[in-house]
């Protein structure tokens, strides 16, 4: 489900993270590059699952999480902060859809 604002609130989101289910890391990275070429500041921020980070791996004996590992290669984030206009959000959405 897409996030939404109520009439009495203003959102404070700054990123909208998307998962390209079934995509490879290379496909995700190409989409990010294509979005950047169109002026959209897409980024892959969550490259390392928390269970693989040394603190958690060493102190909590984190077990393997294969779906989490796969998701880390498929997710990327889009800029959706309060300064982004409705028109810009529509452009971002339409551009993503045209590229996938």
Language model regions located:
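PLP-dependent aminotransferase class I/II
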Residues: 1-100
